[in-house]
Amino acid sequence: MRTPTSLDAVAEAHVDALASHNPLNATWCGLPGHDHELPDFSPEATGRWADELRRTLHLVREAPKVDEADEVTAAAMTERLGLELESIEAGDQLAAVNNIDSPIQWLRDIFDLMPTKTDSDWANVASRMAAMSEALDGYIESLREGISRGIVPARRAVVDAAAQAAALSGQDSRFRGLAAGSGRSGALRGELERAAGIAAEAFGNLGRFLTTELAPAARKADAVGRERYQRASREFLGARIDFDETYEWGVESLAAITAEQEALAREIAGSSATVADAIAQLNADPANLIHGTDALRDWMQRTADEAISALDGRYFTLDPRVRTIEGMIAPSATGGIYYTGPSADFSRPGRMWWSVPEGVTEFTTWQEKTTVHHEGVPGHHLQVGQAVAQAENLNRWRSLVCWVSGHGEGWALYAERLMDEFGFLNPGERLGMLDGQRLRATRVVLDLGVHLGKPAFDRYGGGIWDYDKCWQLLRDNVAMEENQLRFELHRYLGWAGQAPSYLIGQRIWEQIRDDANRRSGQDFDLRDFHDRALAVGSLPLDVLREVLAG
């Protein structure tokens, strides 16, 4: 066990400050003591947090660096906290509205992670729901300041968010459903019902504000522009990239993956078959179909458990606590698939969540096996779980709090490709993996293209990328149900920089591995590389590159 240093103490204090400033983060990380609270989203609270960031950055600079772990912590905290402060100073939080990752969804989805076994647990749920009005009032206050300063989200994102708020405000609000399904009685049941009414009313008020005040003031253009995109890209990658070179690489990658997929389609369905023909053949095979969410959950669990058994000790060295993962069906029904990490003590295991859209009852294993590898092992669960298991060697900021999308999502895509390289996919499942790769390459082209005003493909009429051209690009390259595909497009438009972090992150991970292979020559050991890379936790990718080159 490593002896904690003064810099670790700075990092630990920052975790405690973060838990108080944003209790949602405490719940996400499994930190106790804040499950009854909600954040203050007001401009005043954000200003206080900016002061805390400045203070912590000063302490990080001044603290002695006694070992390599300290050097890594200092580099990562300087990059992450410095960028967060830069974003606050630019006012990015004043336009934080989209359909997938903004205060609206954070406040909705946090209840999925809260314990609900005891009366005390349910009392926390009631307290959080009762605090919703104050939390959303602070959020509205920040959005109003954004209007006054001319920092506003796109109108399309506001319309989507207003629809989500409305869905949370009616008599069938999920908050009322929480209270009704609690199994509690007496005074606690009454408190849950009262709190659910407060939460539903608060979201109704938010929906009216979004519709009547923010939507008329919102910008018509979906694109955020290069200046905002610079910060967004760094937020999700932890690396500085050449946008123009990366866009051209994305175009080339999309073409290469498409050719690879087309060749495999001919192998599956005949010499003249298209990708659509191969997909139709795979979808028609009953062996590839799952009916109902219960069967989907069971298949997710079985597939994840099989991967853990096959990989542990051969390609990776799993901490025994990481061998447990749970497949879950999310109650939100929005169409996303995501992972939530274990709590600090592993009392809450890592979980794969499938948010199944309303009316979707049939699922295809050939297309989704790679998704389980992405969310489970060797993807997010291995990566996040191994970091949490390093708590005795890493401070809590490193093991629990620091999460960089390009590092995490890039690793998960890298993991998908590894499963193909290791021979775990049959031809149909490999087509599914390539389908996912094609989606991620499409995201690079679309996201950089629309937000930076890049020229659209001639086959879509030239000019610059806009909504209709982006939709056609997705329709031509992504095998996804139409409602979910529309949700994806709106996600990219409203959450700039996040979607391309997957494939760009994979690219950087592969560059780092190839660099290590060249340095080590015949002594290169893939399992050792993986173990070392995962042991340092999630890092900004520029920091990771330096660490693994050392």
Regions found by a protein language model. Name each.
Residues 1-550:
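N-terminal maturation segment of proteins
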